[in-house]
Amino acid sequence: MIFHLKSFLIVSLIVSQLLHGNLKADSNWPSWRGSTGNGTAPDTSNPPKEWSEEKNILWKTKLEGLGHSTPVIWEDKIFLTSAVPFGKKTIPPVPDNAPGSHDNLPVSQSHQFHVICIDKKSGKIIWKTKCHETFPHEGGHKSGSQASASPVTDGKYLFAYFGSHGLFSIDCSTGKIIWKRDFGTMATKHGHGEGSSPALKGNTLIINWDHEKQSAIYALNKLTGENLWKAERKEVTSWSSPLIVEVDNTSQVIISATDRIRGYDLNDGRIIWECSGMSNNVVASPVSENGKVYLGCSYDKRALIAINLNGAKGDITDTSHVMWSTNKRTPYVPSPLLYKGTLYYLSHYQGILSVTHAESGKTKSGPFRIDSLREIYSSPVAASNHIYITSREGLTIVISHEDEPKPIAFNKLEDSFSASAAIAGNYLFLRGENYLYCIGSKQKN
């Protein structure tokens, strides 16, 4: 069944003022998909369902440069990354020479790579750290950015990853760089740029270094930046971010890629299990719940695979550990959302939403064609039994989480959004190309 969700008018009633009360830290959002890795907020979170430029905007802060990385949040601080072009422009710009390159932005200026810390209450910049300065070797796809990988934090240190331009450990209080790592220069497929975000568990930081040359997974000591282990792999570029889950009393690092999906032992890098079935362009990241993991791709072939991790060993392709799979309406850029046993995912990067029982793979309702949402690069998030989906054109649809989801609101902001939303307590944070927005109600403090 396909039906159309029609936009309706959200009338602005009042102009919101800056919030001078306390933004409660009901939860942190320490990585690009939150503390669960699934894009979900705790049940205590209850952000607004309606907003506009004149309604429920507590503050918005102008951002320098460009970045599609998601903000991460710890208590009263928000952290984000940005790439800032500067200096004289090269004329003509330097084109990408990657095989098969298309729709890429040629590089015309040097860039500074910044980390910015913003006060969650006021939106004021607390500190800004310049991590690196260089003339990028790739411009990347025209829809991307030079700062697309999201940082991750444990509250004491922030780990900001700029791919070929370095990994930086930064003191959250002062902005001081503690250590840095240079992994070399990536050669991404078609020169489309970099974007896999790091994952953190305990003292171990995981980096996906898949590209067109020698690919590898790095496990680093978060205190020193030194290798704990390195697993070399025969993989092409994948933009998928690692997911760390606990299964059979073992922490597994799960990474989706073209040749194989693999689960690595977090302690030593040993491959626990592997499975084929992904495409040549893997962008979406996995989600997991109750010992199951869900992985999707959509270009150049469509696939969505559900895997039971319990007892999985060796090559599990075509075994009973593959619970179900589909090649219909699978995700490309936005990752799936896994919320209370339901899998929400968008077709390619378009406004066609599938709602599926995660365990069985059976359609729960829909699919739904959302006419108002055209290009969607950000991944859906969920809070308080509602789903939030934001398009690049600045429109967010809020949908109820129930057996038959209903549209609750269509909210428009005058900015372009590729970064995924972050949720902290009763507040939603949207990072646009020009501004960072704090969305909340004055009554909820």
Locations of regions flagged by a protein language model:
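Cleavable N-terminal signal peptides
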Residues: 11-13, 19, 23
